[in-house]
Amino acid sequence: MPELKTVGLFFITAIAEIIGCYLPYLWLREGKTIWLLIPAAISLALFAWLLTLHPAAAGRVYAAYGGVYIFTAILWLWLVDGIRPTVWDFVGVFVALLGMAIIMFSPRPA
């Protein structure tokens, strides 16, 4: 799977997971309607399905996905929560994405 497609799929997967967790947060912490649990459940089911689309071993996919999830969560912090990330947030994202790239794209024996 080409690298750009892999990272793009990870990004879409992260959005599905974050939405699936953010909607119950809105219900529990912000007093929003319980009906948010329906799209949350759909989003989490989509998240699980998207993880199955990668041809790599599941454990490797889950480990590498974490790096893109961290990037997406910090982006969410900035765009949705309105909190500007710190320099340390950006450093952490860089380290996580570097780890993701090493895990997913390093050469493997055939």
Swiss-Prot record:
It comes from the Bacteria. It is a multi-pass membrane protein. It is found in: Cell inner membrane. GO terms for cellular component: plasma membrane. Disulfide bonds: none annotated. InterPro entries: UPF0060. The chain crosses the membrane at residues 7-27, 33-53, 63-83, 85-105. Keywords: Cell inner membrane, Cell membrane, Membrane, Transmembrane, Transmembrane helix. HAMAP family: UPF0060. Belongs to the UPF0060 family. PANTHER family: UPF0060 MEMBRANE PROTEIN YNFA. This is UPF0060 membrane protein PBPRB0495.
